[in-house]
Amino acid sequence: MMTTRRGRRGRLLIAVAAAALTLASAGCSSDGTATASGDLVGLFRLDPGTVDGSSVSGSWFRMVQPAGTPKDGPFMPNGDSPVQGGTVTLLSPGSEGGLRVGGFQSEPTPGFSSDGNSLSGSIMKPTRFFGVDFGASTNAVDPQTRRAVVAPSVRVEGGKLTANLTAWAASWNNQEFNQGAPKAPAAAGPQVPGVAQATRAWDWVQQKWLGQDDASSGDGPPATGTYDASSRHYTLEWTSLIVGGPFNGFTGVWHLEGTYEPSAAAPSTAPPSTTR
């Protein structure tokens, strides 16, 4: 009897230890990126771009010359950037600190200074590019194509980000360039079909609700990136063909990096949203 009891007791202790190890493992994985999934709404703060020797970190932009590739170039050198021979332009956070997801950060009125410098400074600080400041905004109606587009959205699955940034627009030298991913529909031709995320979305610059009926979700590949659920550190990267202007046929390469801050899609002071 003593041997049987000891055997049973030993097996019981082993089972308890195994269960404890299983729970501990589950607890560790719950804090990691593998279990994180769903839509992310709030502010994606930008880390300013920095350079250390040949290493670039933080947020940055570069432009691929026609027939080049985002990985190998050749890249268009920006005469106002000292980084890697001008082939990388460092970005800094704007007045909102970064990219708002679930709403818009539209181009202000006016959108340019008398010298053609962009005044879009909510997402990123306007940055010098060939003697003129360029900025970025997200708009319910794309400034270049005049197409209605959806508000930015980001989804995480197992530490990987997929983002709709169709509304992303760059402004420079009194000119507008859609730099979204997926790409906004062209100015001419049929509207690319898409399903709006919400009937209305808040504009953090204009401080009002904007309609999203019949807004396009764009065409082509989305922005992609990484997300660490523990630290909330993220990266987002995409490419977008430049159409029109002096850089027609070039491709913009955007890299955003920083920390995600969950928050509502509109401020608490916003009036109630109505569908009409």
Where are these regions (language model features)?
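Extracellularly exposed regions in secreted/surface proteins, prominently low-complexity, repeat-rich
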Residues: 209-218, 223-276
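Predominantly extracellular/secreted and cell-surface proteins with exposed
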Residues: 63-213
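Sec-dependent N-terminal signal peptides
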Residues: 14-20
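Extracellular structured ligand-interaction cores
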Residues: 41, 151, 158-160, 233, ...
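Bacterial N-terminal signal peptides that target proteins for export
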Residues: 2-14
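N-terminal segment immediately downstream of the Sec signal-peptide cleavage site
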Residues: 30-97, 238-264
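C-terminal motif of bacterial Sec signal peptides marking the signal peptidase cleavage site
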Residues: 24-27
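Composition-driven, intrinsically disordered low-complexity tracts enriched in small residues
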Residues: 29-38, 44-45, 191-206, 267-276
